[in-house]
Amino acid sequence: MIDQAKAPRQEASPPSKFEHKVTYVPPRTKFAFGMTEIRDLAIATLLVSGVGLSMLGFELLNIQPLLVVLLLALFTSTFLMHEIAHKITAQHYGLWAEFRLTLIGAVITLISIISPFFKIIAPGAVMIGGTASKETIGKTSIAGPLTNIIFCMLALALTFVQPSSSPPSPFVVVAVVTAFFNAFIAVLNLIPIGILDGWKVFQWSKIIWALAFTTSIILISVLLAQYGSLLGFSL
């Protein structure tokens, strides 16, 4: 039981002549897209899809138009899920997060479309704002590549659903290309240099970075060893 002492009675203060109203409401961290973000994502998606098509071998360039459309949709999904994973994770920790196109990144990605050997996919990044610890930044950074690793594993597993044939069925082609594209983006982003995701993950946890990077390397190695000719690589 709590016995609360009564305070001495005080006279009410006179009413104030001043009034106030709320003129600023802090932005909520709910999951939403701004118009600038949508525009930048649309441009970046076109660039990424262009790089994806340029990575296909000559055998895949002669496939049915419907299959090309499906592959473009998968390239788009791969890129968007990577960036959205960053965004959702950042907002989960109460941070402001929106994707922004960067000029140098967009130019490098554009060059990668026409270059037969130089392939870098970095049209922009999810910008975050707010106070964040090294752990929060690390978890936000690993979210994108981890999403790609999961999608790669799922797509690779689908290749075992249908018996192998020569030439491979459209189903296998889509699964293999999807797996390879996800593995490629994961490996690229996990390189521990500069502004890439890998450097932020490495600074947070070297063990988690090593596990993620090693897994992505193994996945892309398996795909190249098993389906190198399908992907246009001579191994």
Language-model features and meaning:
Residues 1-235:
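Hydrophobic transmembrane alpha-helices and their immediate loop junctions
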